[in-house]
């Protein structure tokens, strides 16, 4: 699986950080909001690590949604 594909664990982690959401590992194998949402209980250790990597990377960049 490519890290930066829309819906990937990395992408979902970065998006959760961007929108100021809590860390809640998940991903969408068929693209964001397409098909089934895979939650942490069903993710591999590598998928969970990719989610946290995306979240942490966005936190380091400080790239957040401006709601104003």
Regions picked out by a protein language model, each given a short descriptive name:
Residues 1-68:
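Intrinsic-disorder/low-complexity detector
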């Amino acid at each position: 699986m490519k890290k930066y594909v829309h819906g990937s664990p990395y992408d979902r982690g970065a998006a959760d950080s961007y929108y100021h959401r809590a860390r809640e590992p998940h991903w969408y194998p068929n693209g964001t909001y397409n098909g089934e949402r895979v939650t942490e209980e069903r993710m591999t250790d590598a998928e969970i690590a990719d989610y946290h990597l995306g979240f942490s990377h966005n936190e380091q960049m400080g790239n957040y949604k401006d709601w104003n």
